[in-house]
Amino acid sequence: MEFDPVKINTSSIDHVTILQYIDEPNDIRLTVCIIRNINNITYYINITKINPHLANRFRAWKKRIAGRDYMTNLSRDTGIQQSKLTETIRNCQKNKNIYGLYIHYNLVINVVIDWITDVIVQSILRGLVNWYIANNTYTPNTPNNTTTISELDIIKILDKYEDMYRVSKEKECGICYEVVYSKRLENDRYFGLLDSCNHIFCITCINIWHRTRRETGALDNCPICRTRFRKITMSKFYKLVN
């Protein structure tokens, strides 16, 4: 059976391209998620979405001598660190359609594809990957000293902020004992972070504490642990995000 580009449906979620190959007369449905990494101008393919067993087998293969040698050689030939030849998007509600193990397309075409027993699926997968790469060739137009951010990096950043928000929205101020995000005034819904400890305060309460201490000539210290601090940082999250 020949690969037919007409049967491809393309969509995207959070910088992930989703290719769906649908051939209803032959009862064939194949979904391939691809991320194009602009930093090293290559492509990463989600093998979990193709078949979860492929991801498990890849992890086992990578630990064996043949896998380690292949990864070492691929890293050398591409100039990409071994740790950057694979990426993972975690499973959560926001990522339910794109989560999984993404690996360098070379690993898919030259290694993983041979683990697929259905030769028709093999052929279609190879055709999908080659079709996508041929139609999405990237030519850099930024100066060599300009650092670009990849789609995977963007997703990781969004995940980090989502996690930080989820934890922050439950935090209470250690002075007024109110949930910081539930305060009546919007300007009060910020944390005041001390550089000396990790105790939680809303920006309003810790500023009042700080001002009162200054007015009375007392030391600037944490209301809970009494550790002296030098500055207060206003933040939307309960701790600084690196």
From Swiss-Prot:
Keywords from the named record: Host cytoplasm, Host-virus interaction, Metal-binding, Modulation of host cell apoptosis by virus, Modulation of host ubiquitin pathway by viral E3 ligase, Modulation of host ubiquitin pathway by virus, Transferase, Ubl conjugation pathway, Zinc, Zinc-finger
Zinc finger (RING-type): 173-226
Subcellular localization: Host cytoplasm
Recorded superkingdom: Viruses
First-level EC class: transferase
EC number, UniProt record: 2.3.2.27
Limits of the KilA-N domain: 21-131
Entries under Pfam families matching the protein: KilA-N, zf-RING_2
Record-stated family: Belongs to the orthopoxvirus OPG021 family.
Role noted for this protein: RING-finger E3 ubiquitin ligase which catalyzes the formation of both 'Lys-48'- and 'Lys-63'-linked polyubiquitin chains. Plays an important role in virulence by acting as an anti-apoptotic factor.
Designated name of the protein: Host range factor p28
The encoding gene: OPG021
